[in-house]
């Protein structure tokens, strides 16, 4: 007959045993089925940048400033014509500009606006929010002045046309009156009555 186990021996036996942790997913049949159908996640093709690369990029940013990402345009935005398309009658297809718009040499408003906007696109200079806001405000002001000038030119053109129409109308009116007077004079002349004599 085997002797009785001491408490320390019992404790040592339970402690030495390796503990097994099994996930509930594998014990539950429904969860196990769902796990079998789950798609296997692939590793991303783009590798994560190393610390060295990150430091290098940060140094470049400190020296030269952040580079603006070039905008990529879709085919719809570029208005590229689609080939072999049926021509719909009566529908005008949008085309590009037919000619260049030249700016007058002494048109300072437009020239200043163009200089400011072109510089904005091509210069990769980092500026404070206040400076940028100030520059954008200047561009907006120039655009506003340009619009006002265009409206003024439009109004002047319209006024000239109105004056021309009024002149034409007044000339036509005077002609009508003159013709009416002439007709009245002709009516006032007494008609010679015809006399018939019998022999």
From Swiss-Prot:
<dbReference type="GO" id="GO:0008298">
    <property type="term" value="P:intracellular mRNA localization"/>
</dbReference>
<dbReference type="InterPro" id="IPR037650">
    <property type="entry name" value="Loc1"/>
</dbReference>
<dbReference type="GO" id="GO:0005730">
    <property type="term" value="C:nucleolus"/>
</dbReference>
<dbReference type="GO" id="GO:0000447">
    <property type="term" value="P:endonucleolytic cleavage in ITS1 to separate SSU-rRNA from 5.8S rRNA and LSU-rRNA from tricistronic rRNA transcript (SSU-rRNA, 5.8S rRNA, LSU-rRNA)"/>
</dbReference>
<protein>
    <recommendedName>
        <fullName>60S ribosomal subunit assembly/export protein LOC1</fullName>
    </recommendedName>
</protein>
<keyword id="KW-0813">Transport</keyword>
<dbReference type="GO" id="GO:0033592">
    <property type="term" value="F:RNA strand annealing activity"/>
</dbReference>
<comment type="similarity">
    <text>Belongs to the LOC1 family.</text>
</comment>
<keyword id="KW-0175">Coiled coil</keyword>
<feature type="region of interest" description="Disordered">
    <location>
        <begin position="1"/>
        <end position="57"/>
    </location>
</feature>
<comment type="function">
    <text>Required for efficient assembly and nuclear export of the 60S ribosomal subunit.</text>
</comment>
<dbReference type="GO" id="GO:0000472">
    <property type="term" value="P:endonucleolytic cleavage to generate mature 5'-end of SSU-rRNA from (SSU-rRNA, 5.8S rRNA, LSU-rRNA)"/>
</dbReference>
<dbReference type="GO" id="GO:0030687">
    <property type="term" value="C:preribosome, large subunit precursor"/>
</dbReference>
<dbReference type="GO" id="GO:0042802">
    <property type="term" value="F:identical protein binding"/>
</dbReference>
<feature type="compositionally biased region" description="Polar residues">
    <location>
        <begin position="24"/>
        <end position="36"/>
    </location>
</feature>
<dbReference type="GO" id="GO:0000480">
    <property type="term" value="P:endonucleolytic cleavage in 5'-ETS of tricistronic rRNA transcript (SSU-rRNA, 5.8S rRNA, LSU-rRNA)"/>
</dbReference>
<keyword id="KW-0539">Nucleus</keyword>
<keyword id="KW-0690">Ribosome biogenesis</keyword>
<feature type="compositionally biased region" description="Basic residues">
    <location>
        <begin position="168"/>
        <end position="183"/>
    </location>
</feature>
<keyword id="KW-0509">mRNA transport</keyword>
<feature type="compositionally biased region" description="Basic residues">
    <location>
        <begin position="7"/>
        <end position="16"/>
    </location>
</feature>
<feature type="region of interest" description="Disordered">
    <location>
        <begin position="145"/>
        <end position="199"/>
    </location>
</feature>
<dbReference type="GO" id="GO:0043022">
    <property type="term" value="F:ribosome binding"/>
</dbReference>
<dbReference type="GO" id="GO:0000055">
    <property type="term" value="P:ribosomal large subunit export from nucleus"/>
</dbReference>
<feature type="compositionally biased region" description="Basic and acidic residues">
    <location>
        <begin position="145"/>
        <end position="167"/>
    </location>
</feature>
<comment type="subunit">
    <text>Component of the 66S pre-ribosomal particle.</text>
</comment>
<feature type="coiled-coil region">
    <location>
        <begin position="122"/>
        <end position="189"/>
    </location>
</feature>
<dbReference type="GO" id="GO:0003729">
    <property type="term" value="F:mRNA binding"/>
</dbReference>
<dbReference type="GO" id="GO:0051028">
    <property type="term" value="P:mRNA transport"/>
</dbReference>
<dbReference type="GO" id="GO:0140691">
    <property type="term" value="F:RNA folding chaperone"/>
</dbReference>
<dbReference type="GO" id="GO:0101031">
    <property type="term" value="C:protein folding chaperone complex"/>
</dbReference>
<dbReference type="GO" id="GO:0017148">
    <property type="term" value="P:negative regulation of translation"/>
</dbReference>
<dbReference type="GO" id="GO:0042273">
    <property type="term" value="P:ribosomal large subunit biogenesis"/>
</dbReference>
């Amino acid at each position: 007959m085997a002797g009785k186990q001491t408490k320390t021996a019992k404790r040592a036996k339970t402690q030495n045993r390796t503990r097994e942790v099994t996930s509930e997913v594998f014990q539950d049949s429904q969860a196990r089925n769902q796990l079998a159908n789950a798609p296997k996640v692939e590793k991303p093709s783009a590798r994560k940048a190393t610390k060295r690369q990150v430091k290098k990029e940060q140094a470049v940013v400190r020296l030269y400033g952040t580079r603006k990402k070039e905008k990529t345009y879709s085919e719809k935005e570029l208005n590229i014509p689609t080939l072999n398309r049926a021509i719909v009658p009566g529908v005008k297809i949008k085309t590009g500009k037919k000619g260049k718009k030249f700016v007058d040499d002494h048109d300072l408003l437009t020239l200043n606006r163009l200089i400011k906007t072109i510089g904005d696109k091509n210069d990769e200079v980092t500026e404070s929010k206040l400076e940028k806001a100030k520059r954008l405000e200047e561009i907006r002001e120039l655009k506003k002045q340009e619009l006002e000038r265009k409206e003024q030119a439009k109004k002047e053109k319209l006024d000239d046309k109105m004056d021309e129409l009024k002149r034409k109308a007044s000339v036509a009116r005077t002609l009508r009156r003159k013709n009416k007077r002439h007709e009245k004079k002709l009516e006032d002349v007494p008609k010679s009555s015809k006399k018939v004599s019998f022999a």
